Swiss-Prot record:
Reactions it catalyzes: 5-(methylsulfanyl)-D-ribulose 1-phosphate = 5-methylsulfanyl-2,3-dioxopentyl phosphate + H2O
NCBIfam families: PRK09220.1, salvage_mtnB
Gene Ontology biological process: L-methionine salvage from methylthioadenosine; monosaccharide metabolic process
Name this polypeptide is given: Methylthioribulose-1-phosphate dehydratase
Lineage, uppermost ranks: Bacteria, Pseudomonadati, Pseudomonadota, Gammaproteobacteria, Pseudomonadales
Binding residues annotated for Zn(2+), in chain numbering: 96, 98
């Protein structure tokens, strides 16, 4: 294992422990990845507890989502990760989480997007410099056909190049960043804002 791969793998392992510890990636849910180079990514293997990841629980894939390591099976949602790396060369890490807040809020919001506005913490997202604008978070219906789901995500990405993440209804959050630390920051910001939105909804009823 070369030094770069070892470092990126450790970042994935550490992210899993942090996200599991916060309750945002329970049991074997969720998947994480990091860009290895222009043609490859490192992803968590399928069905592993994210708070107990080891070096053998991460594998390399190409950007079409194919495993490059015989005997290791990538997550079923690998294509949603590699799609992002192919779309934007600046992305270095992708995190998919299954928090209660993201799951519930995605079911409560009517329509195809959540609009965040007037929150100071919006500035935690890459490219956002003021609370006064809107951050649109698209919500895609869950689909076991990942290629079909990816085909619905792609047009949104192309039309919204500064999109910080998206939700899958009843499922969870996808967000990303130039580095793993950036992706983790965005997960944390999203979770704070999702909790705020849920409290606003509950108090307005």
């Amino acid at each position: 294992m070369n030094d770069n791969r070892e470092q990126l793998t450790q970042q994935i392992i550490d992210a899993g422990r942090f996200l599991y510890g916060r309750g945002w990636s329970p049991a074997t849910s969720s998947n994480y990845s990091a860009r290895l180079d222009e043609q490859r990514a490192l992803l968590t293997v399928s069905g592993k507890h994210k708070g107990q990841l080891g070096f053998d629980d991460v594998l390399a894939t190409d950007l079409a989502g194919n495993s490059l390591e015989p005997g290791k099976k990538p997550s079923a949602e690998t294509l949603l990760h590699t799609q992002l790396y192919a779309w934007n060369p600046a992305i270095g890490a992708v995190l998919h989480t299954h928090s209660v807040n993201a799951t519930v809020l995605s079911r409560l919001v009517r329509g195809d997007r959540l609009v965040l506005q007037d929150y100071e913490l919006q500035k935690a997202f890459a490219g956002v410099t003021t609370h006064e604008g809107q951050v649109e978070v698209p919500i895609f219906d869950n689909d076991q056909d990942i290629a079909r789901l990816a085909s619905r995500v792609q047009p949104w990405l192309e039309a919204h190049p500064y999109c910080p993440g998206y939700l899958i209804r009843g499922h969870g959050l996808y967000t990303w960043g130039a580095r793993m630390s950036d992706a983790l920051r965005q997960v944390e910001a999203f979770e704070f804002l999702f909790e705020c939105e849920l409290k606003v909804l509950s108090l307005s009823r």
